[in-house]
Amino acid sequence: MENTLTCSKTFRYFTFGNPDDAKYILYVLHGYGQLAEYFIRKFHDLGNNYFIVAPEGMHRFYLKGSNGRVGASWMTKEARELDISDTQNWLNHLKKEIDSNYSFQKEIVLGFSQGGATAARWTTINSIPNQIYWANVFPTDIDPKSIISKENNVNKHFAIGTQDEYFNSEEQLSTLSFYANLGFKTHIFNDSHTIDNITLKEILTDITKK
């Protein structure tokens, strides 16, 4: 018989920038097998206007064998619903803590790969209006219409590389079409499964200019 026990757990997150001076807060959710400590470095050159917050998935593991490099993930197929719930609670708690201490002109969330699915689930239950999904499949357990907003100040973007090894050409086109039909601005760049700096800055410029 399977049993569960609810108890407290310490989660880890990394930040970059000065929240007292920044105009915008950018939550960045890493992909499968990445660590927040290194993922956040992809956003270091955005400038002083951004305070970057990189939460880390609750599961950490050795990427190969039983030693060496470590990565993290947001969930696996095992006890999936429990992990989703725990992650939602932890992200909500983190946002509440930051909101109680700082104020920003704009809040933005970016989810990369597996972190994109996590971001999609998270943004259905909170009020972050500016969303960037990057090289991810939309999670099948939530209604896509739940992220559609009629508010004028909402910005939603999706980006993917032409050489992304996790999407063949047909899958790229269908994924781009899926997000476009939801009202997302879509972006495609000439690279693999990665964050493209030029595309990122173009998206952020579009979000922050309004």
Task: Show the residue positions of the predicted features.
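Serine-hydrolase catalytic machinery in alpha/beta-hydrolase-like enzymes
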Residues: 7-19, 23-102
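Short beta->alpha connector loops
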Residues: 31-35, 114, 136-140
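Short, well-ordered alpha-helices that flank and scaffold nucleotide-derived cofactor binding pockets
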Residues: 41-44, 124-125, 177, 181
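Active-site nucleophile loop of the alpha/beta-hydrolase fold
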Residues: 55-58, 132-140
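Residue in the alpha/beta-hydrolase core beta-strand immediately N-terminal to the catalytic nucleophile
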Residues: 108, 130-132
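Gly/Ala-rich beta-loop-alpha elbow adjacent to hydrolase catalytic centers
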Residues: 110-115, 119
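Hydrolases whose catalytic domains are alpha/beta-hydrolase-1, hotdog thioesterase
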Residues: 118-122, 142
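The feature captures the conserved acid-bearing segment of alpha/beta-hydrolase catalytic domains
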Residues: 137-209
